[in-house]
Amino acid sequence: MKNRIMLVAALLVAGVAQALACTNFIVGKGASKDGSVIVSYSADSYGLFGELYHYPAAKHAKDAMRKIYEWDTGKFLGEIKEAPETYNVIGNMNEYQVTIGETTFGGRHELHDSKGIMDYGSLIYVALQRSRTAKEAIKVMTDLVKEYGYYSSGESFSIADPNEAWILEMIGKGEGVKGAVWVAVRIPDDCIAAHANQARIHQFPLDDKENCLYSPDVISFAREKGYFSGLNKDFSFANAYCPLDFGGLRACESRVWSFFNMFNKEAGEKYLPYIEAKTKEPMPLYIKPDNKVSVRDIQRAMRDHYEGTPLDITNDLGATAYKMPYRLSPLTFEVNGQKYFNERPISTQQSAFTFVAQMRADLPNAVGGVLWFGTDDANMMVFTPVYCCTNRLPKCYSSEIADCVTFSWESAFWIYNWVADMIRPRYSLMIDDMRAVQNKLEDTYEDAQAGIESAAKAMYEKDPAKAVAFLTNYTEMTAQCAVDSWKKLGEYIIVKYNDGVIKKTNEDGTFMRPRYEQGHGAPVIRPGYPKEFLEEIVKATGDRYKVY
């Protein structure tokens, strides 16, 4: 999300945590269980308010202009010509199921152009309003930066439709130089791919227009700048425009590795030494999974903290007594002049919103495109179905009732954050209560999907407007149901874990009452601390707390 802070080779610098943001996963239609193309995205940025964006379909006057504001800051950048017609966009998917996500890789800082008009966020939402296919979106985005200039630092974009998925990587040409250098590679249908704030495209085919597109000067510009001097066939976009450093490896590529490791154990084992900086062979842009992948699999992947791998962060002192899989920002720290770091997992507390986009070619667009969406950290919220035809925002996902500094009990973002911030400090004690509610809701939405879509498809064949209204209402209902359930969960957690103890419950989950009717104290359990944590306290304090 935010421009990436440049890292020194072999060491992370202090304060980098706030800049290393966002993760994208991609699943080709031949790699998914049901033939869906799947794209996931977490918008990870401290201070960003999590909301669902909506741009209604519209017709525009011939000479209409559009004002462009930087997505991150709201800064006015300039104006561009408006398209005659723009399409309905809900979140990061449009009415034709075209979906776009991103991660910022930053790259060479000297290539930033402060005079450019198109920032990465505007590229996403303008392209969604103007494109019917992924390839068309790539053309819209690259044409826009060519005509109006590119304002942001280096970006990786996931661009997909019901039939194909691409990764587009782009970086500017420097101050006052209009345009960008870029390359786009199609992900094979039977493969999965990922990017996470480090440029991922190395060598690419120079003569395969069906599967690879690139700017005419992507190699020659690198030669002019002194970034590359070899043969064209050996050119690596990533090496030229975003040389890998320790931060890019351990805070960024490690998330890609974790995703690959989940779905292809051989690849996980092969590239673990690369992540540990023991070997230099980079991971491929895409791999084949061991088994077909589902939407629920990708939802779970977005909740990953390296559990069960050598990068697991739940078993050291930083996890505290209750195995918290999070670390506070910044991720780097210094002790006696030596710099250290904490791992940066896929799931992280600063996520504003996360989605898993499901695109299907065997259904009408209005029914086939589902943005499984939630605000806050994927691990601590519920993915609810948002159909791409939705033409009205669920109130709980709207910025009209709350913002980044305005709390509301009606806001999904603040309700999810409220509960998450209670759970994290005592994670292992409390997480099962949250997971039970989360699983129940997501199981319900998954089980209902086929029936809802069958009914919607039948409606669509007779009256498309009726189907759109039906799916819009369903989108609103499921979002609100999740928020209402989360409020009750928060109330339950406050009561159950008040004052550091655990109130006892009956078999049906209700709280035990005092033994006598006039009693005022509920039965409680005093959990204390795990044995391993107590042993660490004794090691650190010696006889300080010894009982004589």
Question: Where would I find each of the regions flagged by the language model?
Answer:
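Sec-dependent N-terminal signal peptides
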Residues: 5-15
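A contiguous strand-loop segment
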Residues: 22-120, 140-293
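Histidine-centered catalytic/metal-binding microenvironments
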Residues: 438-548
